[in-house]
Amino acid sequence: WIMGTFDQVHGLAGWQWLFLLEAIPSVLLGLLTFKMLPNHFSQAKWLSDEEKAIIDKNLKKDLDGNSDAKGKSSFKDGFFNLNILKLGAINFSMLLCTYSMGFWLPTFVKSTGVSNLLHIGLLVAIPSIIGLVAMLLIGRSSDKYRERRWHLVLPFVFGSIALFLTQMFSTDIVMTLVLFSIAAIATTGTIPVFFSLPATFLSGTAAATGFALACSIANLAGLVSNTLVGYAIQLTGKPEGALMVFAVCWVFSCLILLSLPK
């Protein structure tokens, strides 16, 4: 709707207005978060003293029950840690798929025959909504069963299969959305579970350092994702060819996950 309505308003293309208008809520929310979000749960005004005590007790219980994390709490433990590098590689794959799907999904939808910009925008929102719902369900299941690895491996496996199958249904809008929705579960739905992994074998400063390092490695995906997609499309001659690269990335991510401590 934005691209169609605001195209050439004040000399700007519709896609330029899209970036400008969609950026405003993010910027405002960032400023609001910086001002209102406390640094520690003990500073949260919306929590009662009893609730703060429960949170503190649960955090200490998690740390005491995690034998792998004991004694590994320094900056050095978090920075020079092979498992953290593995997490960085996994997160790199996750972001690579997330960025590429986010930027190129409209192209894949358009290739099925949908041409109206508003319709494309509404359709590409479906996988994101499903990924959001999956995020809540997968996170709840992971906490319920106190299990992390297989709550990541299984979505990655199904996501990889879905991306492989996209080539067979490149002109079918329904199957395209179904397959991309499965892929969205693997990218978006697994985020909370993934970011709970550093605390399973690190604690304190080491966990924070490891978290930051894994994110820094992963953010390199933003630099290479579009270039990689463009090169893959040029090489294969069709947009779906780029998805094979991401499917392979998820396969390697599964292997790396299975090598991490339980």
Named regions from a protein language model:
Residues 11-75, 259-262:
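Central mid-sequence intracellular linker of multi-pass
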